[in-house]
Regions:
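Short, charged cytosolic
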Residues: 49-73, 219-229
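C-terminal, active-site-flanking charged/polar segments
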Residues: 282-295, 299-300, 361-370
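Short, non-transmembrane cytosolic segments of multipass membrane proteins
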Residues: 35-64, 177, 199-215
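Membrane-embedded catalytic scaffold of the fatty acid hydroxylase/desaturase
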Residues: 120-241, 305-394
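Short juxtamembrane and helix-loop transition motifs at transmembrane-helix boundaries
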Residues: 73-85, 236-245
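Alpha-helical bilayer-embedded segments of polytopic membrane proteins, i.e.
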Residues: 82-128, 155-159, 212-227, 243-293
Length: 400
C-alpha cells in the first residue's frame, strides 16, 4: 500500500501487478512516513487477497462515495436498526449473573474458594464493560440519555471505571485509529508502539521496552488497576464546561459508591490476607481479560503519521484486524472480533456485526481494499512480533 497522501496504492512498477507477500515476522508495523510500502498478512475468506498495486488511485470524491455506497447498502439491509429485544435479554442476564457472583461471595464467606469467585467476577466485570462499551457507542437505545445512563451505571457504578473519561479517550481512538500522536491507544506509556518511542527510552524504562513482548501479558494483569486510576485522576481534572463538571460530579459519586462498597464488602467478608488475595486475583484477571479482548484489534496493523491524509473507509479498514471465530468468540470478545465492521459503523448493535461482515468483506474485495482477518492465537502472535520488533533499537546485540 503506497504512502501517497490519500490513496494508499503502490507506485507503478514492472512488478506492480503481483500480490505482495506479508512483511517478515520481525518487522514492526510502521507509519506511512517511515516507509513507502506497508504490507499486511491479509486473509480474505472466500476471496483472493486484495492487490492494492493493481488498483488506480481513486479521486477524493470517489473515495467519499465509496463509503457512502457501503453505508447505503448496510442501511438498506436493516443492520443499523436498534435491537431492544437482544439488549433487554443481554443486560438482564448480565445483571443476574453479576448479582449471583456477589451473592455467592457473601454465602461462601471466609474461604480460599473465594479465589474462584474472584475469577468468575473478573469475567462478569469484563462482560459488564462490554455493555458499557455498547452504550457508549449508542448501540443499545435510540435515546442518547438512556445510552449514557446505562453506560454510567455499568461502567462507573458496577465496575468502577470512569465512563466519561473512557468515552473521550475512545472517541479519539475511533477518529484516528493507529495515527501516531493522535490515537491515545498507541501513546507512549508502559508499552512502546513505535521505534521512535523506543529509541528515547533509558534506564528501567528501556529495559521494559527491550523485553516488552515477553512482558506484555503479565503487564495486562495491571490493566484493571491502571483503568481505575486513570478514571479517578480524570475526576480531578477541572477543565471543561459547567455541564461536564456537573457530569463529573455525578460520576465521582458513582465511582466512590463502587469503590467504598467494593472494599467494605471484601474486607467485611474476608480476613485481611484473603481479602488482599481476592482483590489481586479479581482485578488482575479483569485486566488480563479486558486487555486480551482489545489487544488484537489494531496492534501490529499499519500505522499512519499524524499528518497522513487517508479517507475514512481506508483509515478504518486498513488499521483494524478481525478475529475469525463463532458465536462463543462473539460472546467472549464482546463483538470486538468484528473490529472492521465496528469501526465503520460504531453505532451498529453488536448482534448485527456478524451479518454486516460479509457485506463489508465483499465490498472491500470489489474495491481492492485489504481486509485483514485471522485467528485469535495468530492475532496474539502478530501483536507480540510487532512489540518485539519495536523494541529492537533497545537491544544492543542488534544493529539499527
Amino acid at each position: 500500500m503506497q504512502a501517497r497522501a490519500a490513496g494508499l496504492h503502490c507506485a507503478a512498477s514492472p512488478r506492480a501487478s503481483r500480490t505482495r507477500r506479508p512483511a517478515p515476522a520481525s518487522e514492526p508495523a510502521r507509519t506511512l512516513s517511515e516507509r513507502q510500502t506497508v504490507t499486511t498478512d491479509i486473509m480474505n475468506r472466500g476471496t483472493e487477497p486484495a492487490d492494492p498495486a493493481g488498483i488506480s488511485e481513486p479521486s477524493p470524491g470517489s473515495r467519499g462515495s465509496e463509503y457512502a455506497a457501503l453505508s447505503r447498502e448496510v442501511k438498506q439491509s436493516g443492520l443499523l436498526k436498534r435491537r431492544p429485544g437482544y439488549y433487554s435479554v443481554k443486560v438482564g442476564a448480565n445483571l443476574l449473573l453479576l448479582a449471583a457472583g456477589w451473592t455467592a461471595f457473601a454465602l461462601i464467606g471466609d474461604s480460599w474458594w473465594q479465589l474462584l469467585t474472584a475469577a468468575f467476577l473478573a469475567v462478569m466485570f469484563t462482560q459488564t464493560g462490554f455493555i458499557g462499551h455498547d452504550a457508549g457507542h449508542h448501540q443499545i437505545a435510540a435515546s442518547k440519555r438512556v445510552n449514557n445512563l446505562l453506560g454510567r451505571v455499568h461502567a462507573d457504578l458496577l465496575i468502577g471505571l470512569s465512563y466519561g473519561w473512557w468515552i473521550a479517550k475512545h472517541n479519539r481512538h475511533h477518529s484516528h485509529p493507529n495515527y501516531v500522536d493522535r490515537d491515545p491507544d498507541i501513546a507512549d506509556g508502559a508499552i512502546a508502539f513505535t521505534q521512535d518511542q523506543a529509541r528515547v527510552r533509558s534506564g528501567a524504562y528501556a529495559w521494559l521496552g527491550r523485553h516488552q513482548a515477553w512482558l506484555f501479558f503479565p503487564m495486562l494483569l495491571l490493566e484493571g488497576l491502571a483503568l481505575h486510576v486513570a478514571g479517578v485522576r480524570a475526576m480531578f481534572d477541572r477543565a471543561g464546561t459547567r455541564t461536564s463538571r456537573v457530569t463529573k460530579l455525578s460520576e465521582a459519586g458513582l465511582l466512590t459508591g463502587h469503590l467504598v462498597g467494593y472494599l467494605v464488602a471484601v474486607f467485611l467478608v474476608l480476613p485481611p490476607v484473603q481479602a488482599v488475595c481476592f482483590i489481586a486475583v479479581h482485578q488482575g484477571l479483569f485486566g488480563l481479560y479486558m486487555g486480551c479482548s482489545f489487544a488484537p484489534n489494531h496492534k501490529g496493523m499499519p500505522m499512519f503519521a499524524k499528518d497522513d491524509k487517508v479517507d475514512f473507509l481506508r483509515r478504518q479498514v486498513l488499521t483494524s484486524r478481525n478475529i475469525r471465530g463463532h458465536r462463543f468468540t462473539d460472546f467472549a470478545l464482546g463483538g470486538l472480533n468484528y473490529q472492521i465492521e465496528h469501526h465503520l459503523f460504531p453505532s451498529m448493535p453488536r448482534p448485527s456485526l456478524r451479518h454486516a461482515q460479509e457485506i463489508v468483506r465483499t465490498f472491500c474485495a470489489r474495491h481492492g481494499i485489504a481486509y485483514h482477518e485471522t485467528g485469535l492465537l495468530s492475532s496474539y502472535a502478530q501483536v507480540l512480533r510487532h512489540l518485539h520488533a519495536v523494541g529492537g533499537p533497545l537491544r544492543p546485540e542488534l544493529e539499527y
